[in-house]
Amino acid sequence: LPMKFIVSSTGLFSHLQAISRVINSKNSLPILDCFLLELVDGTLSITASDSETTLATSIETTESDSNGRFAVNSKTILDALKEIPEQPLTFEVNDNLEIIVKYQNGKYSLMGQNADEYPQAANLGGNAVHVTLGAPVLMNGINRSLFATADDELRPVMNGIYFDIT
């Protein structure tokens, strides 16, 4: 597992922040308080989940020496990265899942978790549909229907917008 990679601090932070919204403070599995990071051929894939909803994103690394995967607590890494201005971050992960994040003015030491404990996202099967929409089209549709949504904890189904793709 020993691995090392270099990635942009603000690029990584914005990707982590975008998918962190799915992480619930009342998770049934402690591993779901973490981001799953998987490095394959220079691409860092990041996953966040609450077991019902899974969000994933990816970012290109500047440099990487091997493939690997680990989980890291979302709050810990977000709090560490939000204070760092744009610069390259060097991540070093050893066999004990100790993560050293080096930056210009110092380093952070974090404890990772075994990625094998992270639940796999459900396979969508053969009847999944892939749709590409421009951001303005999607935002226009959301803005036109947002008025009809509720903020009711007792009826969570009313809190969202239903997409019917046929």
PLM feature spans:
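Structural preference for solvent-exposed beta-strand-turn elements
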Residues: 1-166
